[in-house]
Every structure is written in C-alpha cells, then in structure tokens.
Curated annotation (Swiss-Prot):
UniProt similarity note: Belongs to the tumor necrosis factor family.
Protein name as catalogued: Tumor necrosis factor
Gene: TNF
Post-translational modification: The soluble form derives from the membrane form by proteolytic processing. The membrane-bound form is further proteolytically processed by SPPL2A or SPPL2B through regulated intramembrane proteolysis producing TNF intracellular domains (ICD1 and ICD2) released in the cytosol and TNF C-domain 1 and C-domain 2 secreted into the extracellular space. The membrane form, but not the soluble form, is phosphorylated on serine residues. Dephosphorylation of the membrane form occurs by binding to soluble TNFRSF1A/TNFR1.
GO cellular component, one term: extracellular space
Transmembrane segment boundaries: 36-56
First-listed, main subcellular location of the protein, grouped into a coarse class: membrane
Gene source species: Tursiops truncatus
Length: 233
C-alpha cells in the first residue's frame, strides 16, 4: 500500500468517527485516534524510505579487500594451466638437407630439447616416468598419380625399457590418389598432411620414433611442416 493511500484511509476514518462520536468524550477519542494515525503514517513512510534507498535491508556478506570467490572449476583450470618449468619437453623438426630420408634435428629455430630429453639415433629418449603428450606431423607432396596404388603411412613407435621391442603407439595411412593420371593429361600436384597425437604413460629410458614409409614424397619446401615432439604432463 502506498503512503498516499494510507493517509486517505486515515482521513476517511476520522470523518466517520466525527459524525458518530458526541461531546467531549468523543472529541478525546478522536484526538487519540488522530495522534495514533499520525505516528502510524509517519513510521510507515520512514520505513518505506529506508527500504527504498537501501539504508536497511538483508545483511550482505563482506569479504576482505583483494579476496575473490572462485568456483571449483575455475580453480582447477587455473592450477592446471600452471605448468612447471622443469618438466621434460621436446620439439624437433625434419632436416631439410637430407632428401630421401627423415632425420630429426634440434638445432633449427623454434626447436627444443629441455630438462634431460635427448635425441639419440633419431629417437627421443624419455628422461622420467610419467604421462606424456606425444605428437607428430608430416606433409607429403607429389605430382600426378602412378598406375599402382599409393599408400602413405606415418607411425609413432615406442621401444620400452621393460619391453625392448618396437610397439606402435600411433599409426595412420592415407592414399592421395584415387585413380591414375591419364596419359597425356596434366599431372596436377597434390598434398597430403598427416597429424597424430595422444597421451601415454612412459618410463624413464623409453625411446620414441616417428617414421614414414615413403620419404621421397616428403615436402621439405618449408621448415616446420614436418615435426615431432613430447610434453610431460
């Protein structure tokens, strides 16, 4: 109910009492009722103003300066993004000068061997036990399609300390040619990238290799198109 409605109701009540009450006794009662109504209206108006302008209301929980509420999901994401600088990591690229074979190098720009990871015999050597992200990409390029089927393979293998036999961790095969290029037709160039990646539990001393079956088709036109790496998680 608004303040104007309350005042109007009080006035109507006073008028009704004035008509029915008589003598000094009636006047006294009207005076008491008027005073009571005045204080009631004044109190209601004051309470309305205090609530409207937020002077009083539900108590709000206060926190020290600089303290923020973070959801459990946000805390998990924040902690997982803080990777330790002493974790093993490696990123090597293909040697562009070794046509006809895939040889990995860590001496080019944007390559990395950190925290005890080694590159030996064209293999990455794992320095500590743990979970690792293993990834590799190769890019094949050709001109036209031969009469025989052309299959391109890319395999990431592991030679474990506990089981010294080569085991394929990731493997992919692609065929860029659907049919032979007709005799006399223009031999159009084709490109076929293969990317692979996965997370594996590795042991200290494990050796990892990334190999292909037809290195003559590798595209060495630009550095960074063919690479191999691991990241400790």
């Amino acid at each position: 109910m608004s303040t104007e409605s309350m005042i109007r109701d009080v006035e109507l009540a006073e008028e009704a009492l004035s008509k029915t009450a008589g003598g000094s006794q009636g006047s006294g009662r009207c005076l008491c009722l008027s005073l009571f109504s005045f204080f009631l209206v004044a109190g209601g108006t004051t309470l309305f103003c205090l609530l409207h302008f937020g002077v009083i209301g539900p108590q709000r929980e206060e926190f020290p300066t600089g303290y923020s509420i973070i959801s459990p999901l946000a805390q998990t994401l924040r902690s997982s993004s803080k990777t330790s600088s002493n974790k093993p990591v490696a990123h090597v690229v293909a040697n562009l000068s070794t046509q006809g074979q895939l040889r990995w190098l860590n001496t080019y720009a944007n390559t990395l061997l950190a925290n005890s990871v080694k590159l030996e015999d064209n293999q990455l050597v794992v320095p500590t036990d743990g979970l690792y992200l293993i990834y590799s990409q190769v890019l094949f390029r050709g001109q036209g399609c031969p009469s025989t089927h052309l299959f391109l393979t890319h395999t990431i293998s592991r030679i474990a300390v506990s089981y010294p036999s080569k085991v394929n961790l990731l493997s992919a095969i692609k065929s860029p040619c659907q049919r032979e290029t007709p005799e006399g037709a223009e031999a159009k160039p084709w490109y076929e990238p293969i990317y692979q990646g996965g997370v594996f539990q590795l042991e200290k001393g494990d050796r990892l290799s990334a190999e292909i079956n037809l290195p003559d088709y590798l595209d060495f036109a630009k550095s960074g198109q063919v690479y191999f790496g691991i990241i400790a998680l």
